[in-house]
Amino acid sequence: MAQYSAEFKQAKVLVLGDVMLDRYWFGATNRISPEAPVPVVRVQENEERAGGAANVAMNIASLNVPVQLMGLIGQDETGSALSLLLEKQKIDCNFVALETHPTITKLRILSRHQQLLRLDFEEDFNNVDCKDLLAKLESAVKNYGALILSDYGKGTLKDVQKMIQIARKANVPVLIDPKGTDFERYCGATLLTPNMSEFEAVVGKCNTEEEIIKKGLKLISDIELTALLVTRSEKGMTLLRPNQEPYHLPTVAKEVFDVTGAGDTVISVLATALADGRSFEESCYLANVAAGIVVGKLGTSTVSTVELENAIHARPETGFGIMSEAELKDAVAQAKARGEKIVMTNGCFDILHPGHISYLENARKLGDRLIVAVNSDDSVKRLKGESRPINNLENRMAVLAGLASVDWLVPFTEDTPQHLIGEILPDLLVKGGDYKPEEIAGSKEVWANGGDVKVLNFENGCSTTNVIEKIKLLKD
């Protein structure tokens, strides 16, 4: 499938649906409350993530594709927090803020990797007049290549038929990840993406492939769909269209750690590819590959362009590619659970040269996984001067991601990655040059955790500064 690409130059996607804020409180539990027989959690850390339709938008943004998100929120602190979280990822938020309802929020309290309690703050939107939302949709939809309607049964899509008709009038394909058993309400959509359980709840038990195909085609006819994609867990996914052969894709997941949000990833990549002008077959292929990546991560996660490109071209050595700090912590936890030795290094890597290549190859040989932490553009500028970096962060990480020696990449904004190293706690911290181990940022944290620190030599004569000076001489 080398002709397929994860670069979506023309795509623009609009998402409308039930938006949520997922909050996580983490803490230690060492005693039982004297007030009631319940554990006392001393909260030490918290995290916020976009949920529901907002997670769909996050998936699209992670592919470097313009995305607008519409939905209903409250005029409250959580609505503001969700908007800020999304805007940081360059997602265009076009919400209707209600005085009468709170922003849907799910607060999870965890200790020792176990969820102790979930608190839901929500009221369904079935009694809300959605005329403002419909007006926003009608105004914006013509500017996008695909519309995703993300249904979590909270009421934002109570006028889903009107939404479908607005998109059809604008000749924009409508993709829906359905909720419940009333699929007739999605009549006229371009494509539905039910999982096998949702599909069988509507059409009845399917014991053979022939039954899946027959009942799927009947469903397409009954509710006037263009296509139906049934996601089937370990059996992959099956695309059905009238008068065309079924298109089946086996699963590409090597290891499954968590299926949370996999459906969001499938519909996000599918819509993005269709909006980019790809065929149904190519779009489903890319969505299937993306699903195989995301189920290998813990929690609600996204897939980057680099990860998708690597997976398409069968580059397993690059692992999960570019990650956030939270994603990296999950990936490291999984790798350590498998008994893998984690090596970590850091640098600017502004202009990659043979010295960098050999250094990273030597570092990789010291363990099973190599993490490379990369200075942000502002961090490089503070360290190297106003004329640096030559290459921006996105380009520097994209080049590093193509190296077989590099498993994971993570950016950091500080002058040193000391905080990041303290969070990741690799088994081995590596630095190139003439440092003493105790001078290396993060060494104390690694030693305190039982890890080791090692200094590697750079190749003589290889440096970014030398490369820049040679380029200046050529210009002169």
UniProtKB/Swiss-Prot annotation:
Keywords: ATP-binding, Carbohydrate metabolism, Kinase, Multifunctional enzyme, Nucleotide-binding, Nucleotidyltransferase, Transferase. ATP binds at N195, M196, S197, E198. It holds the Pfam family CTP_transf_like. Residues 344-476 are annotated as: Cytidylyltransferase. GO terms for cellular component: cytosol. One of its GO terms (biological process) is ADP-L-glycero-beta-D-manno-heptose biosynthetic process. The keyword Cytoplasm does not apply. The keyword Kinase applies. Pathway: Nucleotide-sugar biosynthesis; ADP-L-glycero-beta-D-manno-heptose biosynthesis; ADP-L-glycero-beta-D-manno-heptose from D-glycero-beta-D-manno-heptose 7-phosphate: step 1/4; Nucleotide-sugar biosynthesis; ADP-L-glycero-beta-D-manno-heptose biosynthesis; ADP-L-glycero-beta-D-manno-heptose from D-glycero-beta-D-manno-heptose 7-phosphate: step 3/4. Signal peptide: none annotated. Its EC number is 2.7.1.167, 2.7.7.70. Residues 1-318 are annotated as: Ribokinase. Homodimer. Catalyzes the ADP transfer from ATP to D-glycero-beta-D-manno-heptose 1-phosphate, yielding ADP-D-glycero-beta-D-manno-heptose. In the N-terminal section; belongs to the carbohydrate kinase PfkB family. In the C-terminal section; belongs to the cytidylyltransferase family. This is Bifunctional protein HldE. It comes from Haemophilus influenzae (strain PittGG). The gene is hldE.
